[in-house]
Amino acid sequence: IIQGDRNKSEDIDKIDFDAYGCIVDMCLFFEAQYDLFVDRMNESTNYIFVSSGAARGDYMEHYGDYGKDKKRIEERLKESKLNYKIVRPSYIVGKGNHRPRLGHYMNKIIHREHIEIAGDGKNVVNVVFVEDVVNQLVRLATTQARTYEMIEVVGDNIEVIDLIYKVFKYVLDDAYQGNVMLVQDDEKAILPKNDFTFETNWDYTKLEEGLKDYAKWYYNEGAKKYGYII
């Protein structure tokens, strides 16, 4: 794991880029960060840029500078001589994910707390399980050829309200008593109110299968990892 402040040239200078046959870049957000390392990279190094579904043209307007910056980096890579590959995940969910979207819903439902949603909650979003993202990263990392591949790593499309209802099914019966209210709060909602859908023909983890597996993990270790109380 390469660690340091990628915004500082002196930290970038400490990296022996020639020592790496493959680099998976998960924290490149700004074009200025790209400029700091691109000339230091070996052109034959298998470089995988983790972009975002927000970089797709029909969704960029909903994600402000984040989507635009990711898109610009994609364009810079295409102009470069690097051996690049690009991954665009949708909303990542699942075991160990650093943003516990499903865990957030599980915790709220278990404690019978209200859940904030954006808009009426009927917008359709796409969720992909972290295992699927990892599998695609491994595949690309072991493909040294210059494929210049760009892949949208996605899963099932579902209305936000339906996603919450499906999570509800996997909360154990010994949860707290009471009702769970859905409250419109665009700022606190963990999923925005715009549609965010994708289509794919690759073999991904289906939502029901992934939720069932996630719930077991959540009760065994996930809640503790995220600091939630069951």
Residue ranges and their predicted role:
Residues 55, 92-93, 133, 158:
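Conserved sequence/active-site signature of Rossmann-fold short-chain dehydrogenase/reductase
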Residues 1-44, 54-60:
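NAD(P)H-binding glycine-rich loop region in Rossmannoid oxidoreductase-like domains
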Residues 106-116, 123-158, 172:
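Alpha-helical substrate-binding/gating segment
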Residues 34-80, 84-88:
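Conserved Rossmann-fold NAD(P)-dependent oxidoreductase catalytic core, especially the SDR/UDP-sugar
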Residues 139-193, 212, 224-230:
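Mid/C-terminal beta-alpha module of Rossmann-like enzyme folds, strongest
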Residues 2, 24, 46-48, 85-87, ...:
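Hydrophobic/aromatic beta-strand patches that form the interior of the parallel beta-sheet core
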Residues 87-105, 124:
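Flexible, glycine-rich beta-alpha linker
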